């Protein structure tokens, strides 16, 4: 499978027609498993934001997208922006993405502890939380007094906590370095809404927000 057309140009300027032309029976030639990773489970880009709503496993998309995403039933609030039209696979639930990722990582840790507990491993776990849109799973809706985005932050805390518990459960915690990081500061509209609605500043005590050169930005 490739994301380039016959002329070698990236398929990114023709709406959904280009996505509909993808041959999902073919492998992804430049997938992470061909770039040093033993296993991969994830998405092409942000899992609740961009065009192709389907999971990649290894170098394949086992359940290809077959329809257009229906955004009508999705949450509609100041933190639900950044969710674009796109092709979606059957059973792909935008509000449960992080719990799917969590189960995959827990399964990896369990399997590693059985097969080679003394062998070093590298697990790169990318959450959707707390990137917009803030689609907290049903389990976490209303868990905080800070609205949908606060619930999404709560879900991220839960995911991190569950991964830490898994390390401890499988005897991996004492010899594992855990790094929690972000690629940038909080999104501008999110910060504005959270400040106005809940007196919460996602970058506090640092200056700036996403796209700023200050320590709270990029």
What are the residue ranges of the model-derived segments?
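Short, solvent-exposed turn/loop segments enriched in Gly/Ser/Thr/Pro and often Arg
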Residues: 1-7, 40-48, 122-133, 180-188, ...
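Catalytic-adjacent loop/helix segments of enzymes that bind and process anionic phosphate/sulfate esters
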Residues: 10-23, 89-123
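Sec-exported extracytoplasmic/periplasmic mature domains
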Residues: 42, 110-114, 161, 165-172
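Active-site His/acidic residue clusters
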Residues: 50-60, 105-152, 187, 193-196
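Short, well-ordered amphipathic alpha-helical segments that serve as non-catalytic structural scaffolds
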Residues: 104-105, 156-165
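The substrate-binding groove and active-site-proximal loops of carbohydrate-active enzymes
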Residues: 86-99, 142-155
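Catalytic-site neighborhoods of secreted/periplasmic enzymes
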Residues: 1-87
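Histidine-centered active-site microenvironments of extracellular/periplasmic hydrolases
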Residues: 18-25, 32-33, 132-135, 139-152, ...
């Amino acid at each position: 499978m490739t994301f380039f057309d016959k002329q070698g140009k990236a398929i990114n300027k023709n709406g959904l027609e280009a996505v509909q032309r993808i041959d999902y029976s073919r492998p992804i030639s430049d997938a992470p498993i061909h770039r040093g990773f033993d296993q991969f489970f994830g998405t092409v880009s942000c899992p609740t934001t961009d065009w192709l709503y389907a999971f990649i496993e290894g170098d394949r998309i086992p359940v290809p997208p077959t329809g257009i995403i229906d955004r009508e039933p999705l949450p509609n609030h100041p933190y639900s922006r950044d969710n674009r039209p796109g092709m979606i696979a059957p059973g792909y639930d935008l509000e449960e993405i992080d719990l799917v990722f969590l189960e995959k990582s827990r399964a990896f840790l369990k399997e590693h502890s059985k097969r080679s507990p003394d062998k070093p491993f590298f697990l790169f776990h990318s959450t959707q939380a707390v990137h917009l849109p803030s689609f907290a799973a049903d389990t976490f809706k209303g868990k905080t007094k800070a609205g949908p985005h606060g619930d999404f932050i709560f879900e991220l805390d839960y995911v991190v906590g569950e991964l830490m518990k898994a390390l401890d459960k499988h005897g991996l915690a004492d010899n594992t370095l855990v790094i929690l990081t972000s690629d940038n500061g909080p999104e501008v509209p999110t910060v504005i809404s959270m400040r106005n609605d809940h007196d919460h500043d996602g970058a506090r005590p640092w200056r700036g927000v996403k796209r700023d050169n200050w320590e709270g930005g990029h």
